[in-house]
Amino acid sequence: MKRKIRRLATIAALSLSATLWAQGPHETGIYYQPADGKSGAELKTAIGEIVLPHVQRTYKDLWEDFKSTDVRADGKIWDMYSCITNYTPGVDQNTGTARKEGDNYNREHSMPNSWFNKEYPMYTDLHHMYPTDSWVNNKRGNDPFGETDAPTYSSAEGFSKLGPARDGLGYEGIVFEPADEYKGDFARAYFYMVTCYEHYVNEQGEHKSISSWNSTMLARNVYPALSQWAVEMLLRWSADDPVSEKELNRNEAVWIIQQNRNPYIDYPGLEQYVWGSKSDVAFSYDHYGQETDGIRQAAQTRLRDGTVYTLSGLRVDGRPLSKGVYVRDGRKFVVR
C-alpha cells in the first residue's frame, strides 16, 4: 500500500514538474496551450478562440490607454505615421481639427473601422489602435496598406506615403505605405485582427464572422481571411521588420489593460505556421521553434563569455537568465 502511495506521489510530482516546465513565452504559462499541435487554418481558429475573450474598451478609454501603451522613453507619444512629432500624452490630443502635420494626434484604426462597419469589439481593440498624427491619418483615410513608387502625398521626410500601388504588388488602387521600421508592427496587428475575429459576437449580440468584412485586403472568408496579395505582402513585411522591444513592451501593456495578447508578437514568425511555409508544421506553444539537436543545457547562472540573445533576437547583456532557450556564439542553450 505504501509503495502504491509512493508511486502515485511520484507520478503526481512528475506531472506537476512537467506542467511547471511547459510554459509559453513572456510568462504566458499555458495561455496558448489549446493551440498546441495545430497548424494552418486549424491553428488560426484555435488561436482566435484563445485571444478573443478580452476586456472591451470604450472609445474614450483609449486616450488614457495610450499613456501606457504608446509612450516613448522621453515621455512623448510614439507616433508610427510621422517622424517629426513630439506629442505630450493627454495634452496634444485631437480636439476636432488638424491643419498640418504636427498639430495633434488622434486614435487610429490601423485596420479602418469602415471595413467592419464600426462594430465593437473591433472598434476599440488596442491591438490595432494607435495614436498617430491627425493630419497624416486623415490623408490615409480608409485606404489599404501597400507599397507605392509614385506617392501623391508623403509625410515629412517621406516617412509615410500615399499613392497608386506599385507594379507587381498584385493590387491596383491607392495604398498607404508606412515607414519600413513599422511595417512589421502593422503586419502583426493585421494577423491578430483576422485571427481574433474569425468568429465573434457584436454589441447587438449577433454572431458574426470576418467573412462579412469588406476590403480589398480581405478575402471574404475565415481562412485565409486575407487576399493573396495582402498575405504575401504582410508576410514579407513581418519577416523584414521582426518583432521589436517596442512591440514586446506594448503587448505587455495591452495585456494588463485588455487581458489578451497578440500571439504574432509572442511567437515571432507564427504567421508562417498559419499562412506561410510552415502551414503544415504542428505548432508547439512551449517548445516553439526549438530543435532538440544542438541545444545545450546551462545551470541558472550569470553567463559572462559572449553575447547572449533570446530566440526573438533581443540582447540579454549578462544578467542572470530566467528559464528558457537562448543563443550564444551561434549555439542554442537551455537554462533550467
Residue ranges: model-predicted function:
Residues 1-12:
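Bacterial N-terminal signal peptides that target proteins for export
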Residues 6, 325-336:
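C-terminal tail/sorting-segment detector
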Residues 12-22:
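Hydrophobic h-region of N-terminal signal peptides that target proteins for export
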Residues 22-87, 273-281, 314:
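N-terminal module-boundary/linker segments of secreted carbohydrate-active enzymes
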Residues 76-97, 103-104, 133:
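Short cysteine-rich loop/turn motifs with clustered Cys
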Residues 95-106, 110-291:
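Domain-level detector of nuclease and nuclease-like folds
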Residues 279, 284-312:
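Residue-level detector of functionally pivotal "anchor" positions at catalytic/ligand-binding pockets or at interdomain
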Residues 316-318:
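C-terminal trimerization/auto-chaperone modules of long, extracellular attachment fibers and adhesins
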